[in-house]
């Protein structure tokens, strides 16, 4: 009956006409999403990384990932965001120095990778393949990235597993993919 109202006969032989009609009459114009790339979404709040302001979570603030942590916005309302120059965490700086062998360009890359993990854009998928001798910090690096984005957004796999049929299904919708 519905097909008849659309002006199409509802016989099984008319399936192609129906599909063509649906494809041409119900087009949705897709455009670029208005995405604010300088936010990090938590369970209970949104952090604007440019202004340092913490705001209440709203579905209007689109983001493809949400970190599984509470910021505690009620506790932060009256506390101004500190402006700390240089490195924020001496322990992380020490880890970076040992992990990169003190190479500044590699440190910048690692920081950029972590920054990219936390960004709210979905323009590219993140993939990092690490290789090296045992005891050089690959697992620690992997754990740090997992803590940053949450275990639900992380996938640990091997290249051999990804080469199997349906291997890429493991990494679908994951923010962080670690191959060892």
Swiss-Prot record:
Keywords: Mitochondrion
Cell compartments where the protein resides: Mitochondrion
The keyword Mitochondrion belongs to this UniProt entry's keyword annotation: yes
GO cellular component labels: mitochondrion
Protein name, entry field: Uncharacterized mitochondrial protein ymf21
Organism per entry: Marchantia polymorpha (Common liverwort)
């Amino acid at each position: 009956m519905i097909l008849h109202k659309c002006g199409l006969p509802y016989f099984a032989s008319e399936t192609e006409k129906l599909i063509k009609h649906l494809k041409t009459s119900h087009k949705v114009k897709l455009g670029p999403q208005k995405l604010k790339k300088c936010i990090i979404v938590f369970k209970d709040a949104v952090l604007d990384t440019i202004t340092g302001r913490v705001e209440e979570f709203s579905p209007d603030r689109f983001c493809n990932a949400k970190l599984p942590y509470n910021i505690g916005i009620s506790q932060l309302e009256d506390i101004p965001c500190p402006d700390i120059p240089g490195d924020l965490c001496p322990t992380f700086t020490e880890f970076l120095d040992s992990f990169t062998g003190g190479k500044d360009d590699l440190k910048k890359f690692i920081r950029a990778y972590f920054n990219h993990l936390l960004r709210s854009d979905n323009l590219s998928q993140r993939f990092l393949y690490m290789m090296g001798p045992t005891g050089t910090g690959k697992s620690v690096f992997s754990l740090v990235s997992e803590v940053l984005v949450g275990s639900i957004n992380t996938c640990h796999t091997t290249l051999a597993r990804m080469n199997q049929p349906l291997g890429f299904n493991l990494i679908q919708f994951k923010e962080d993919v670690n191959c060892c």
